[in-house]
């Protein structure tokens, strides 16, 4: 397995996405599944909408740097089934992130308040459409959470087997 590190922009974007996705997933599922007081529920929603709105332009940057700064593979690894699984897993993560972000915007039933600094208009006003995208968003969030758990599990398995892949994503 190659020991080449990811570029600094890729590392920074990865950990930024990781922190926000883990926070938004845990707090979002808690907000959905638990009977939280209304003030806490609204606070979580406000923070999650603001944080994930921040991810939208960063997602474009992340795609750019993934293509512009690829990490070299060892030739033997390129044909290995685990390498293909890793590529498919990462592609699924990117697709799920994109779907969660897009459906999150399209499900909004009110303007998007970005940390009280900027208010973006609600893109759709038809209740059937916002309800549809709300449903898509919920399923996409579950899929993303499962993919993140699988991603973390794969990293732990690699570490346990003596392949320190995590070191490639650390400064």
Kindly give the residue locations of the regions a language model identified.
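Membrane-embedded alpha-helical bundles that constitute the cytochrome b-like, heme-associated redox core
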Residues: 1-171
